Amino acid sequence: MNPIVEFCVNNLASGADAAFAKLDADDSLDVIEYDCLTYCDLCATSLFALVDGEVVRGETADELVANIYTFLEENPF
């Protein structure tokens, strides 16, 4: 079973789409897009994803990707 990375479609439209594309190319991750993750305040102010249910944030798409991989290293599945 792979780690699950979940994105909100609205956050993708705000710039997280580049992070989604990079992570989706990684076969060791299950990357999923949802209509809404109900984190509207967070979604309106930063790029983020849920990684195995935990919020991971980034100022840019590249930083978000780096933070997700760091989170996964620090929290082995």
Swiss-Prot record:
Q: Fetch the InterPro entries from UniProt.
A: DUF1450, UPF0349
Note the Pfam families from the entry.
DUF1450 (PF07293)
Taken from the UniProt record, the cysteine pairs bridged by disulfide bonds within this chain are none
Q: What family does the database annotate? A: Belongs to the UPF0349 family.
NCBIfam families xrefs: PRK13669.1 (NF010190)
**Name of the protein described by the UniProt record:** UPF0349 protein lwe2340
The species this protein belongs to is Listeria welshimeri serovar 6b (strain ATCC 35897 / DSM 20650 / CCUG 15529 / CIP 8149 / NCTC 11857 / SLCC 5334 / V8)
